[in-house]
Curated annotation (Swiss-Prot):
This is Rho GTPase-activating protein REN1. Residues 1-10, 45-64, 464-473, 555-568, 854-864, 872-885, 910-920 have a biased composition (Polar residues). Residues 60-167 form the PH domain. One of its GO terms (biological process) is pollen tube adhesion. The record marks 244 as: Arginine finger. Residues 434-463 have a biased composition (Acidic residues). Acts as a GTPase activator for the Rac-type GTPase by converting it to an inactive GDP-bound state. Maintains the global inactivation of ARAC11/ROP1 at the apex in pollen tubes in order to regulate the polar cell growth. The gene is REN1. It is a peripheral membrane protein. Disruption phenotype: Male gametophyte defect characterized by sterile pollen grains developing balloon-like tubes.
Length: 920
């Protein structure tokens, strides 16, 4: 009890409001009088009766300021800050400071609740948690209201102010009733009479129609209700808080009067909250309930069955007990509710919220107490029995509507219902309904105020079930406005019913069976086509009997009789201030223990709904993650395959390159071996290729040939020297020729240098020769060797002929000249072979440095072939050129000898010999 509070359990009592406005300090009172909405931000004038406790002059404001309130019992899961005003007789709270300027003209600052003070109360403070608890020993268990301050300073200030107010509060025995709250038995007829005297009651052409004409006019055109339903479906479903937030009563009445005057179409620019309240006002003013009492009993019995058979039982109940017009009207309203609930992400109205707003309008008899609800509440005689019955009835009504919404297709689908099954006996309604018709809507009746004992309770229950809704000030403050006092006719006549032995002995199982968590939930509502009302005239009347809230319970019957004489016009309500549906102050102080019975269901239900929504959200997230992971896995597999293939290709390349490197190393070794063969007899490695092996063998053969040629040259030189010695001793001219021989050798050396330069140029051009080109060169060299040998033989024969000729002519110098020519040829051949050897060495060095991996191009091969051809032709021309050079040299020698002889003949009378004789 210590942790409960008063926002819903203790509804703002009637006596708090008169005391609040008239007895506050002048500054606050003046600010409140400037508010544009009358009692929306202030307290209405004091009512007559109990003048000792409601005097206007002595009720001062001890303290006002913000405090936080919270209670698990009323569905709030966190502390909420409200503006409290403490007077001598009451502690009331508002959404915000009532003296502050309103931010929006459409928002109102109503009294959300309050408690009555008496001198029996006490204050308990928990400083560690900054909690402030007000205790009253009223009734059986007493009352306890817990508040929370922001700071320790505020905590102590509020404690002192509360203790001061309690000491000055009136005595509980003088001003309290059985429940410890002020009674408000009489209305104040003096207030607002001048404002209403000019208004003449007229019969409305829109309101008060029978159920048969609720959806369709006599001429078949859509009725006011049908147009309002379509407007909500088309334009109101995207408005936050539709059907929950209330519009001003005067605006609603003004729109209905405009409709009656000819403005019978709703434009999209109109306020959806006003049209929604017009819709609810129309249903409230129906002569009979949309669901008759007998049908409510049938639905109640069906709702008590287990979950598996509940839908079939409710379908059977509708088929057997519902009149056709009532069934069509119920279906049409449920379709609109489904449309609203299907847009819950936008309008923040889920199935529970829509059912909480519309169930009191659809199931009037159930909330009015005309249906039997099993209970075994034993709470004493303090009136808590009535409140528990009201809470149980509200829970059952909401559970029935939720089931109808969630199982709409199963209950009202194609083929589920047959018009022939309907009974016409229910259309006229019961006699009790007809007799109580005119008592349904009467603002002057005290029962309408007593009905608010459930109004604000349902507000907080709805706050709990709609935990995801915005907690903005406008939404929270306007929530209860959407519930009209007549939506929940929970009257004090329930006290007479509580005296019945039948009611007191009924089991308690119905309350636990009202848990909506046991109902199946399907948020996807489907719509049928619009329903056209057809059938016979319906003369049903309202079925709820209002009972006076007099302290004497036995006088309730006479109060009902007097109430039936009052007109059911909204304009007959006392006071000229604006009103909001569901905001007439209640007069019961519902204890926290009694609320726990009815609200515990909503707490569990909200928890289940939150868990289900969280589960669905997590499942959707898991599905998305699985899809993304599958895509990533596939990409990873493709990447692995690509890398594996790349790895294999690289391994193959590495193996091939290693083999090629080994081959090049072997070739290098073989070439080095070939270069070193001249130094010694080294074997050729077997690992080299055949072409290279042939090249090395040819080089070795060429070196052997060169060695032989050098040996022959040495022999020839020796012979030539020996022959020259003999020749010099025999003739003077031969000695002269021998003296000219060094000059001739010098010229021959110059020619050899030219030849070496040409050979060097040829070797540079042939650095890219392959094994095949080398083989061809070897063949050319062999040809050159054979030709050189033949030229040597010819030279020897020529020289021998020349020697014989010289002998015959007496000139010995010509033979020595021919020998010198042969020697020059051998020298040229030797130089060529040396150049070839240096060429091969250069090739080996280039191959070692460049790491050549491929075979030579065809172009290089062609170049080598052409170069070898040129060299071959050059070598073939060498013997001829030598032959040509030899006669030329001989001619020069003979000419010189002739000159000498000329000179000698001139000096010594020698005959002149023509050198041309031997040039041929």
């Amino acid at each position: 009890m210590a942790n409960k509070n008063a926002e819903s359990s203790s509804q703002p009592p009637p006596h708090v409001q008169p005391n609040q406005q008239q007895q506050q300090q002048p500054p606050i009172a003046n600010e409140q009088e400037q508010e544009p909405h009358g009692d929306t931000c202030s307290i209405p004038p004091a009512q007559s009766g109990n003048t000792d406790s409601r005097s206007r002059g002595g009720n001062t404001v001890f303290k006002s300021g913000p405090l936080s309130i919270s209670s698990k019992g009323i569905g709030w899961t966190s502390w909420k800050k409200r503006w409290f005003i403490l007077t001598r007789t009451s502690l009331v709270f508002f959404r915000s400071d009532p003296s502050a300027v309103q931010q929006k003209g459409s928002e109102v600052n109503l009294t959300l609740g309050g408690i009555d003070l008496n001198n029996s109360g006490s204050v308990v403070v928990k400083a560690d948690k900054k909690l402030l608890t007000v205790l009253f020993p009223d009734g059986r268990d007493g009352r306890a209201f817990t508040l929370k301050a922001d700071t320790m300073e505020d905590l102590h200030e509020w404690k002192a102010a509360l203790e001061n107010a309690l000491t000055q509060a009136p005595s509980a025995s003088h001003v309290m009733g059985q429940n410890g709250i002020f009674r408000n038995d009489h209305a104040d007829p003096a207030v607002g009479v001048d404002e209403k005297k000019d208004e003449t009651p007229t019969k409305s052409t829109v309101l008060g129609r029978p159920v048969l004409l609720a959806l369709e006019d006599v001429d078949g055109a859509p009725s006011f209700l049908e147009k309002a339903l379509r407007f909500v479906e088309n334009h109101g479903v995207r408005i936050e808080g539709i059907l929950r937030q209330a519009a001003d009563v005067d605006d609603v009445e003004h729109r209905i009067r405009e409709y009656e005057k000819g403005k019978n179409e709703f434009s999209p620019e109109e306020d959806a909250h006003i049209i929604a309240d017009c819709l609810k006002y129309f249903l409230r003013e129906l002569p009979s309930s949309p669901v008759p009492a007998s049908c409510c009993n049938a639905l109640l019995e069906a709702c008590r069955t287990d979950r598996g058979n509940r839908v079939n039982a409710m379908r059977a109940a509708i088929c057997e007990s519902f009149p056709e017009p009532n069934r069509r009207l119920l279906q049409r309203i449920l379709m609109m509710m489904q449309t609203v609930a299907s847009n819950k992400t936008v309008n923040r109205m889920n199935t529970n919220a829509v059912a909480a707003c519309m169930a009191p309008l659809l199931l009037r008899p159930l909330l009015a107490g005309d249906c039997e609800i099993e209970n075994d509440f034993d709470v004493g005689g303090d009136g808590s029995m009535q409140l528990l019955q009201a809470a149980a009835a509200a829970n059952h009504a909401q559970a029935i509507v939720i089931t109808l919404l969630e199982e709409y297709e199963s209950i009202f689908g194609e083929g589920s219902l047959s018009p022939g099954l309907y009974s016409d006996s229910e259309e006229s309604g019961s006699g009790t309904e007809e007799g109580s018709d005119d008592e349904e809507y009467d603002d002057d009746d005290d029962g309408s105020q007593g009905s608010e004992d459930y109004t604000d309770e349902e507000e907080d229950l709805e706050n709990e079930s709609n935990g995801s809704y915005s907690e903005s000030a406008a939404s929270e403050d306007k929530y209860a406005d959407s519930i009209d006092p007549d939506d929940h006719k929970i009257n004090d006549n329930l006290s007479t019913e509580s005296k019945s032995p039948k009611r007191s002995k009924e089991p308690k199982k119905l309350l636990s069976g009202s848990r909506r968590s046991s109902l199946p939930r399907h948020d996807d509502g489907k719509k049928d086509e619009d329903i056209v009302v057809k059938g016979v005239n319906n003369t049903e009347v309202k079925a709820v009997v209002e009972v006076s809230t007099s302290e004497d319970k036995n006088s309730s019957t006479s109060d009902v009789a007097s109430d039936t004489q009052k007109p059911s016009k909204l304009s007959d309500a006392p006071g000229g201030s604006k009103r909001h549906w569901g905001r007439t102050p209640g007069k019961k102080n519902l204890s926290m223990e009694s609320i726990d019975f009815s609200v515990e269901v909503d707490e569990d239900n909200a928890d289940i709904e939150r868990l289900e929504s969280t589960k669905l959200e997590l499942q959707s997230r898991i599905t998305e993650e699985v899809k993304s992971n599958a895509v990533l896995q596939a990409s990873l597999e493709r990447r692995k395959k690509a890398l594996y293939g790349r790895r294999q290709a690289l391994e193959q390349d590495v193996g091939r390159l290693q083999e090629q490197l080994q081959q090049e190393r072997d070739r290098k070794l073989a070439l080095e071996t070939g270069l070193n063969m001249s130094k010694g007899n080294q074997p050729i490695p077997e690992t080299i290729d055949e072409n290279l092996k042939k090249d090395l063998q040819e080089v070795a053969q060429a070196e052997a040939d060169i060695a032989k040629l050098e040996h022959k040259v040495d022999d020839l030189e020796n012979r030539l020297g020996h022959h020259d010695g003999k020749a010099s001793g025999s003739t003077h001219s031969a000695s002269k020729e021998s003296r000219k021989l060094p000059e001739h050798n010098a010229k021959m050396k110059e020619k050899q240098k030219d030849t070496e330069a040409a050979s060097t140029h040829i070797s540079e051009r042939s650095t890219s020769k392959d094994g095949q080109g080398a083989a061809r060169e070897n063949e050319t060299e062999k040809q050159q060797d054979s030709r050189s040998k033949s030229s040597q033989q010819e030279t020897s024969r020529g020289s021998s002929k020349l020697v014989g000729l010289s002998k015959r002519s007496g000139t010995k110098g010509e033979g020595s000249t021919t020998t010198t020519s042969a020697l020059s040829k051998l020298t040229m051949r030797l130089n060529f072979l040396k150049e070839r050897r240096s060429q091969i060495a250069n090739e080996l060095q280039n191959m070692d440095k460049g790491k050549t991996l491929g075979q030579p191009s065809p172009t290089s091969g062609q170049n080598r072939v052409s170069e070898e051809t040129e060299k071959g032709s050059g070598s073939n021309q060498d013997p001829d050129s030598s032959k040509l050079q030899s006669p030329h040299i001989l001619d020069r020698g003979r000419s010189e000898n002739g000159g000498d002889r000329g000179r000698g003949s001139s000096g010594g009378n020698h005959p002149n010999t023509t050198p041309r004789t031997f040039s041929r």
